[in-house]
Structures are given as C-alpha cells and as structure tokens.
C-alpha cells in the first residue's frame, strides 16, 4: 500500500500539503444526509470506495489517518479520520462497510441540510438551531455519568454537553431538554452521529455507538459473495453460480467472471528455488500472467505456455498488510473434508475470520514457514509467513490473521 506509513496502529496517508495559502478550512461544505451519510460518504459503502473518493479530491482530504487494532483487526472498527474536518468514518471490521459517521468537532465542519447551513466556525449548532432546522422529535436520553444529552432523529443524533450547574434540568434516562437554560443560554452540539435508519436503534455516545450497523446488501449483490473452495479442483461463486476449475482457459474465465480489472505478467516465483524438481533457469519475468479481479478479492494465474489456470490467490484485505485497499475482501469458505455440509456443522471450515492457530487445529501442523518480505521502504508493515499444505498455501501476518490464500494443484 504505497501511500501510507505506519505509526503504531495508525496508517497515515502520505501526500504533500496541497491546501492553497489563504484557503479557509471551513470553505468546503458537506451535505448532511440523515440515515444516508455525509458528503460523498454513504452508510454501507465499502472501504475501498471511501478511499477512491479521498483520492479523487486530494485538495480537500489532504490529511487522512487510518486507525485499526493491529493485534486483532476483527475486534474493533477500522476508522478513517479527517482531523482537519473534524469527522471520521467507522467501518465494520468484518464486512469492511461504513456503519457510522461521527462528527467529533462540529465547529470544523460546515454542513448543509436542505438549503440551510449548520456547524462550522460561523454557524453554531446549538440546541435551538438544531430544533429549528430538523423540527420536533421525541425526548432524548440523558447520560448522567457522562453529562451528555442525546437528541435523536431517524438516522441522526446530536449530543449536547450539559454544564454541571444545570444537570437538575435533566433526569437520567429519557428526558426532555429545555431549549434554553435558566440564564438564557442554549447547549451547543459537541458530536453528531449519522447511521442507517432502517431500524429504530438510537445511536449516540458510549455504548449507544455500538448499536450502529451496516444496512443489508441489495439482493444479488456480489459484494462479500461466498466463494466455496474445493482445494485442487475449483472455486464456486455462490451468488452468480459460476464454477471456476483449474485448467480453465482465459476465454472460460472471461465468460464466467467478466473482464478482469487488470492483467499483468508474473514475476519469477521466489519460492521456486526451494523446488529441486524445477531445473529451469530463473529470470526476472516468466511467461505466466495474472488476471486481477480486485472487486472480487481474487487473482488468477495462467500458465504462459498452456494458457490454463494454474493458481488462484484469495485476498482478505486486512489493514496491516501491504495489499490493503488494493482488493475487496474475498469471502472464501474452505471446508475440511469432502462433505461441505458436515464441515459447516462441525465448524471445520476456514474463512477470512479464521486465524492461524485455528487453521492448524483444522488441518494439523505443517512444516516451517517461509518468510516473505518486501523491505521497509515498500512495505512498512514487516514480514509475513507462508505455510504450505497440499494444494493450498497460507500467507499469515504477524498477528496470526490470514492475508492471502494461494490455491494450486500438487
């Protein structure tokens, strides 16, 4: 992932500062869409689409932080943060889809709802202003421990800090907040949350934040389509119903999966030096070539002489790997044993969520790992480890999660 460097559990997008001298930070106006999103970012969008939006407008998004939990990337959200604009995007770690927009510094973000402005340095998002713009709603919830009052609309919530001297205006739990305090002041929004409004969940600060979930995918969506793997035989795509066997021709692949996103020649296999049975001279480029299906999390390798499929590479797209944001996550399922139904019942299946210790419990121990590294300049995340079984090789990150799976015929 060329455009990022790693600082702790944070990726920082590296690009020169492009903001023109004298340009106001608040000059950019983001459309506020309750239940839908903010600006170009929509609830439910894949993380790769969010990055595409960022790359298309580098003058606006010139400081971007990507935060994740390095030890267990499935435990916490992947967060894209825009510190200059005061908001961040929270992505569900499993589906890698946007579940929540959090505006944590409302004074930094100029928002437009319908034809009216709110937020930013010149338009305070006070309780009175919010009520006037969005209209009446049900009583909110007061969190006495945090001193925060949350006001809810469909797919949208506002948080207001309550000064200590006025906490008696609120009661813990559901409560109505007066438009003004006794001294004539009105509370000012400290945080805005935007989330899917297909359910009646109230999303706010603290534990309420965890209630935000991604909306269901439309029927027939290929995103996160389950791909069933029969090691040494084929891939089966469960939504489209395509079977992709080893030995298929490029024409077969085009017919079943469509035009590839990219085609490129394969570099010499660095692992072939360990094979005593391959006496061919080693060159930088071999005749083999890849079809890249980035939107499926899949690479297909063809033999340069026979033009038949010889390998499949499946990507998990975890942060902390050099290929992060190059592929959409491939939702593969590898069943241990011949009977897939029995594997489902027993739990003996390998998916992108399966860690390396669990793989060994299912498949048994294997030989020592080969270390794969690209150097700190091109890959700030360090080495990965490649373990081989019959017809399958696992590339494993230092945290024990699978980065890629390579399928071949022994």
From Swiss-Prot:
Annotated source species: Arabidopsis thaliana (Mouse-ear cress)
Lineage: Eukaryota, Viridiplantae, Streptophyta, Embryophyta, Tracheophyta
InterPro entries: PHAF1 (IPR005373), PHAF1/BROMI (IPR039156)
Similarity comment: family membership: Belongs to the PHAF1 family.
Name of protein: PHAF1 protein At3g51130
Superkingdom, natural source: Eukaryota
